[in-house]
Amino acid sequence: MECLMAKLVPRLELPLLPNNIPSACHWDSSSLSQELDQWLISKLGITDESAKRKIVQSRVMLLACLMHPNGERDRVLLAGKHLWVYFLVDDILESSSREGYGALKSIVWSIATTGIYKASEEHDHHDLVLLLLVEVMVELRKEMPTSLFARYCKILSIYLDSVQEEVKHQINNTIPSSEEYRLLRRRTGFMEVMACIMTEFCVGINLEELVVNLGEIRELVKIMDDHIVTVNDLLSLRKEYYNGTIYHNWVIVLLAHDCATFQKSVDRVCEMIKQEEDSILDLQKKLIIKAKVDKNPELLKFAFNVPMAVAGHLKWAFITARYHGCDNALLDGELFHGTWIMDPNQTVIVKNM
């Protein structure tokens, strides 16, 4: 591990990432963002101004608006609440001890499937987050079609089991192989829920079970998951570098097993993002053709809308204070590139001349 640490340097060359998947943003994103931010700040009882600013500048509602631009307003708001709550739940799960994870896993599963959680009298941060999860899951269970919610729970079960495996790696200071990491992150990313199921819910797409299991759709789900995870790992690199969770990241996995230098590992991750985007666009075309040939309007809606979640996540990853620090003038909505200096407080980019 010490040898690996010696290869890490707090600066790298970041190329302009490909951004060719069609994208859009929900028409009411500004109002929705204010509504979600106020909801979270109120529910968590946050009074500190810097903490409020971090929530607002994390732009999580904007992520939902970019992922589901054609969704019904109330459902997109619920998707935004769901995103925020799972960011918080994921942080709690990943920071738990091996002994504590089992209990947390059971609580999260119980909340999702029954909507019941008995909080402690103190109502600490964990309790407040889990009570938020109760609120969101009760509403989701009420509004989501039964078959879609059943798919949701199936993927949630896989996610909870897989995060437990991730926690073991963190506790033992072990780094999985590239293929192990790819397969693990497909399960811990929870992106079939965030990108596919939530888009189907927000837009009102009704896929038959036979269509859900089409080879092209299953492959699209895997590659979309890969793209979102790879972008996440690259753009959250500064944050993870300073908070001590950097070992569970594509850049470090490749550095440990496949690449000789930090920069070569970054370059390889950027190549992966390009390859994943190309595959998504190819699969999207195939699904559009199939939908038209089969005269299946629901599949056509799926093919047009679901890949937007990937494009939306890419844009958000460049503008969120969650990765790049608060009050950062760099976050102007454009995909930045150049010499990336991983300052402890925020992302700094020196434009290459």
Curated annotation (Swiss-Prot):
Q: Domain text from the record?
A: The Asp-Asp-Xaa-Xaa-Asp/Glu (DDXXD/E) motif is important for the catalytic activity, presumably through binding to Mg(2+).
Q: Share any extra remarks.
A: Selaginella moellendorffii contains two distinct types of functional terpene synthases (TPS) genes, the typical seed plants TPS genes (SmTPSs) and a microbial type TPS genes (SmMTPSLs).
What's the protein here called? Microbial Terpene synthase-like protein 30
The processes (GO biological process) annotated in the record are: isoprenoid biosynthetic process
Q: Record's superkingdom?
A: Eukaryota
Sequence positions that bind Mg(2+) 1: D90
Q: How is the cofactor bound?
A: Binds 3 Mg(2+) or Mn(2+) ions per subunit.
Q: Which positions are annotated as binding Mg(2+) 3?
A: N232, S236
Instruction: Please name the source species.
Output: Selaginella moellendorffii
Where is the motif named DDXXE motif mapped on this chain? 90-94
Q: Which family does it belong to?
A: Belongs to the terpene synthase family.
What are the protein's UniProt keywords? Magnesium, Metal-binding
Pfam families xrefs: Terpene_syn_C_2
